[in-house]
C-alpha cells in the first residue's frame, strides 16, 4: 500500500501505522456491530473505511508536497493514535483499551480467534496477498496507474496534458489506504489475535517505510523483498547470537536493530533504487 503511494504516485506518508490501525479498529467494529457478517467481508469493508480516511488526510497533497506533506501525514499519525486511545467507542469500552478477534468460521473451518489454527490463518492471508497483488498490478498498468506516475515524475506537465492532480493524488491516497487498512485488519485478527494502540505507533510507520525503500520504490516485487529483509534478518541475527555465541536476548534485540540500520544505510549507498 505504501509503495503505491510513495513509489508510483510520489506522495510520501509517515502515517502508515495509524492507517493500519484504522483498518483494524474498523474491522473490529464491523464484527461487533454485525456479529453474523462474514469476517472476510468485514476485512474488505475496513479497507474501504480506511480508503475514505486516507483520502481525507490526503487533501493537503493538493497544495503541498515533499517535506511539508510528510509533516502533514505525521500529524495524521499522531491524531489517529490519539483517537484510538481517547475514543472508547472504538474498542467497545474495554478496560484494557485493546481489541481482540473473536472465533469466526468459514466453510466449516475456524479462520480467526483463539481456536483457529495458524495454517488456516496463513492461507487466508495468502489468498488476500495474491488477490491484492493481482489487483495492484492491473491498476498500475492501467490509466489510473499511468496518471499516478505522471504526477510523480512531473506534476505540472501532467496537468498540461490533461491529468487532473485532484483525481490522481486523492485516488492514490485512497487506493494505498485501502491496502493498508486491509493489512491492518489481517495483522490483528489473523496474526496477532489482539492488539492495542502501540501496535500502530510511529515506529511501525518507519518500519514499513524502510521496507519500501530497501525493496525499491515503484516495484511490487521489491515490496516483498524489503519486507523479508526487515522482518527475517533481525530474527536470524537473534537466533545466531543466542545459539552460536550465547549472547543475552536483550543484547541481541538491540544489536539486531543496530545491524538493521547499518544494512539500510549500506543498501541505500550501494543500491539507491532498492
How would you describe each model-predicted region?
Residues 1-274:
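Transmembrane alpha-helices and adjacent helix-loop boundaries
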Amino acid at each position: 500500500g505504501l509503495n503505491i503511494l510513495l513509489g508510483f504516485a510520489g506522495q510520501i506518508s509517515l502515517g502508515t501505522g495509524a492507517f493500519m490501525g484504522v483498518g483494524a479498529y474498523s474491522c473490529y467494529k464491523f464484527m461487533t456491530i454485525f456479529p453474523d457478517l462474514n469476517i472476510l467481508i468485514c476485512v474488505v469493508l475496513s479497507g474501504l473505511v480506511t480508503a475514505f480516511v486516507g483520502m481525507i488526510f490526503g487533501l493537503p497533497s493538493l497544495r503541498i508536497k515533499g517535506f511539508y506533506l510528510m509533516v502533514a501525514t505525521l500529524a495524521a499519525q499522531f491524531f489517529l493514535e490519539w483517537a484510538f486511545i481517547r475514543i472508547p467507542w472504538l474498542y467497545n469500552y474495554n478496560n484494557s483499551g485493546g481489541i481482540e478477534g473473536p472465533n469466526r468460521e468459514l466453510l466449516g473451518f475456524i479462520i480467526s480467534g483463539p481456536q483457529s489454527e495458524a495454517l488456516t490463518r496463513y492461507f487466508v492471508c495468502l489468498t488476500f496477498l495474491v488477490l491484492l497483488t493481482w489487483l495492484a498490478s492491473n491498476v498500475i498498468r492501467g490509466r489510473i496507474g499511468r496518471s499516478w506516475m505522471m504526477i510523480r515524475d512531473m506534476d505540472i506537465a501532467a496537468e498540461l496534458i490533461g491529468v487532473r492532480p485532484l483525481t490522481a493524488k486523492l485516488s492514490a491516497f485512497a487506493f494505498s489506504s485501502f491496502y493498508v487498512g486491509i493489512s491492518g485488519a489481517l495483522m490483528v485478527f489473523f496474526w496477532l489475535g489482539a492488539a492495542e494502540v502501540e501496535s500502530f505507533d510511529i515506529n511501525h510507520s518507519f518500519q514499513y517505510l524502510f521496507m519500501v525503500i530497501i525493496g525499491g520504490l515503484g516495484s511490487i516485487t521489491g515490496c516483498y523483498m524489503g519486507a523479508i529483509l526487515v522482518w527475517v534478518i533481525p530474527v536470524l541475527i537473534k537466533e545466531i547470537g543466542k545459539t552460536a555465541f550465547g549472547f543475552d536476548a536483550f543484547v541481541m534485540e538491540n544489536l539486531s536493530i543496530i545491524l538493521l540500520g547499518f544494512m539500510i544505510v549500506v543498501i541505500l549507498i550501494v543500491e539507491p533504487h532498492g
